[in-house]
Amino acid sequence: MTTYTRKVSAMRAAVHDTFGGPEVLRIEDRPIPTPSPREVLVRVVAASVNSADSRIRGRRFPRGFGGVAPLMFGVRLPRIPVLGGSFSGVVEAVGADVTGVAPGNVVAGTTGMAMGAHAEFVAVRADRVVSVPEGVSHDDAAGVIFGGLTALWFLRDRAEVQLGRSVLVVGASGAVGTMAVQLARLAGASVTGVCSAANADLVRSLGAERVIDHRAVDVTTLPDRFDVVLDAVGVLDRHTGRRLLTPDGVLLLAVASLADTVLARGNVKAGSGPERASDLAHLLDLVAKGEVRVVLDDVLPLDRIAEAHARVDSGRKVGSLIVRP
């Protein structure tokens, strides 16, 4: 483990200055960011490590995005040295133009493309954070964000899931999948989950009426037809997914190739949704009321960031994975 002497006015952060495996990550001192007039400075208590962090670090993107993504994340060297897009913590300071948020407030939020949450402090726009309800832990608040926002946008906004609909969730034990199963169930849908046999009981406990072992059954050959199919892991494309739909069904591709993203039309929905503070507040309220459960694979100190990335890379992560600075 790397050791170093702490600098005044510095923070610990997980940094990568080259692309590669989890081993490229290290902990180093970085300047504590100064919030702009419309930003807040948050002392991070918990941050999630998810597939977005893994893809950027390893420069591994869905098919077709290899020529586009480097323009955002760096061609030869990383453009974003500190990853992490979802966090929970305590407001340390606010910019001159910020109202409604004060030092000491417990908040959760997103960073957008700027990332930076895998550190002791992060500066973000004030409209990107919301209050964490009493009784919701920092780990749960950070853990609900990535999967919850994705699942909510696809199921509620893109497919309009409602009572009596049949929903298939592929990748039902991951961060997106565990939230999708629960949100679909809350909407009154009948849920079928696809995951490994080891996670079948978990997925059932979240509300799936039926669970399919992806190692035993090729999901693309299922004889069943569903009103909504949400692929959270990139198993399906617009052709194989459509075969699983009822005549008026909707296919949701959370991990889509460039071609599927560009050519998504009609009953095929792909792409990434907005990170709306109102949606995050809604999800946190559901957690506070006990209506959804945040599944946590592990909670690790920031010093073990490489281990966290390796777990994400393995494809065996269950729910969300949290690091604490």
Q: Where do the protein language model's features map onto the residues?
A:
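Short glycine-centered segments of the SAM/dcSAM-binding site in methyltransferase folds
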Residues: 106, 166, 190, 249-250, ...
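C-terminal hydrophobic helical "lid"/dimerization subdomain
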Residues: 4-9, 280-325
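Mid-domain Rossmann-like dinucleotide-binding core that forms the NAD(H)/NADP(H) cofactor-binding site
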Residues: 102-103, 142-213
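A structural motif shared across PLP-dependent enzymes of the aminotransferase-like
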Residues: 113-126
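Glycine-rich phosphate-binding loop and adjacent beta-alpha segment
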Residues: 232-292, 324-325
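Glycine-rich beta-strand-centered segment in the early N-terminal region that forms part
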Residues: 31-48, 62-113
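A short acidic, Gly/Pro-enriched loop at the edge of an enzyme's catalytic core
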Residues: 221-228
